[in-house]
């Protein structure tokens, strides 16, 4: 769901997953992960949201090679489990770390549709649960951007 990696509501990185395949056959995922190691001022001025990077968060940031190695090692552990068991075993950890849990949000959907509600979590299948005046709504597909409602 929200693909931003946040630290105190400042974007530290992002995750993008593209799926390809057949409903009845094999499905493939291409996973892109970006982490802001050190942003220069000219880059920050072009970004339309609060950002941060490892250099600002740590006295001595790790090398990019070390970050990549640890990330790949962790993916080597979680991806086989995800393939075998789905999202359900990761749900509780995801809920504990989700920045918008129990917060009012505005969802920007395709075709300029906007919906607002309270994020109540995710289901075992990974669908986002949004409490709206019309009731609890599940979102499973689409380009969705979550923005905290002020």
Task: Describe each PLM feature range.
Residues 1:
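Canonical protein kinase catalytic loop motif
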Residues 7-150:
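Long, positively charged amphipathic alpha-helical accessory segments at protein N-termini or as interdomain linkers
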């Amino acid at each position: 769901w929200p693909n931003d990696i946040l630290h105190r509501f400042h974007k530290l990185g992002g995750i993008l997953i593209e799926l390809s395949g057949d409903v009845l056959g094999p499905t493939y995922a291409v996973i892109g992960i970006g982490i802001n190691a050190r942003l220069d001022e000219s880059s920050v001025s072009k970004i339309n949201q609060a950002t941060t990077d490892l250099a600002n968060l740590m006295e001595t940031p790790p090398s990019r090679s070390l970050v990549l190695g640890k990330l790949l090692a962790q993916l080597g552990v979680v991806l086989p489990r995800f393939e075998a068991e789905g999202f359900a075993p990761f749900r509780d950890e995801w809920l504990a770390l989700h920045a918008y849990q129990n917060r009012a949000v505005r969802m920007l959907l395709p075709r300029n549709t906007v919906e607002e509600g309270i994020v109540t979590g995710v289901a075992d299948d990974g669908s986002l649960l949004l409490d709206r005046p019309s009731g609890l709504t599940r979102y499973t597909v689409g380009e969705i951007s979550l923005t905290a409602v002020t």
